[in-house]
Amino acid sequence: MAKLTKKQKDALSKFDVNNSYSLSDASALIKEITYTKFDASVDIDVRLGVDPKKADQMVRGIVTLPHGTGKDVRVLVLCTPDKAQDAKDAGADHVGLDDYIQKIEGGWLDIDVIITMPTVMAKVGKLGKILGPRNLMPNPKAGTVTLDVAKAVKDVKAGKIDFKVDKFGIVHTSVGKVSFSPEMILENANEVLQVLAKLKPASAKGTYVRSITLSSTMSPGITIDKSSVAGL
């Protein structure tokens, strides 16, 4: 077992890893146990009682965080020329089509989200092997394949994120930064949980939300008391 650093020991001394905490308390505690020199991300991990191998139990959704992610999301819009100016005006970082497809094929991936249009998906679809494994492939369910690219850009910049359960039945997503106030972290995390609660598959049996953990980059995970979250 790796030896704990002084900072890790300090963090662990501030809470009991065997206890569960209310979401409100955890949102404040996460700021106290994070010692990174940079503004670390705050993440939530929710273990669900679903079988992702079954198509009718694949949990996927979209949530707009009330206070955003705290991250400057880099957006590429792949669109026809008539929509290019709208995308730029909405705040897209990169706008184009064939030129950016070639850049991506050449290894360029300096982006966080790609938004495109149904009419050009035939071209974008050829990038599936590159974008798919990196979770960058545009998807209609995520709102990133749309005719209204300007609205999609604004939504993403405002804190709209999409998530899906992984093969282990866990949903992992960011709910802000350590620099956020406890109230901002709480409200963002609660929004994710409320959206997840509404997405319970009809075919899922037993306990739906099995565990919730709040953590930051490099920090220990704080177990959340599910009873502290209304609607679960």
UniProtKB/Swiss-Prot annotation:
GO terms of molecular function: rRNA binding; structural constituent of ribosome; tRNA binding
Gene3D superfamilies named in the record: 3.30.190.20, 3.40.50.790
Disulfides per UniProt: none
Keyword Ribonucleoprotein attributed: yes
GO BP terms: regulation of translation; translation
Organism: Cytophaga hutchinsonii (strain ATCC 33406 / DSM 1761 / CIP 103989 / NBRC 15051 / NCIMB 9469 / D465)
Gene name per UniProt: rplA
Role noted for this protein: Binds directly to 23S rRNA. The L1 stalk is quite mobile in the ribosome, and is involved in E site tRNA release. Protein L1 is also a translational repressor protein, it controls the translation of the L11 operon by binding to its mRNA.
Species lineage: Bacteria, Pseudomonadati, Bacteroidota, Cytophagia, Cytophagales
Protein name: Large ribosomal subunit protein uL1
Pfam families: Ribosomal_L1 (PF00687)
InterPro entries xrefs: Ribosom_uL1_bac-type (IPR005878), Ribosomal_uL1 (IPR002143), Ribosomal_uL1-like (IPR023674), Ribosomal_uL1/biogenesis (IPR028364), Ribosomal_uL1_3-a/b-sand (IPR016095), Ribosomal_uL1_CS (IPR023673)
The protein's assembly and partners: Part of the 50S ribosomal subunit.
Keywords: Repressor, Ribonucleoprotein, Ribosomal protein, RNA-binding, rRNA-binding, Translation regulation, tRNA-binding
Homology family: Belongs to the universal ribosomal protein uL1 family.
One GO location term (cellular component): large ribosomal subunit
Top-rank lineage group of the source organism: Bacteria
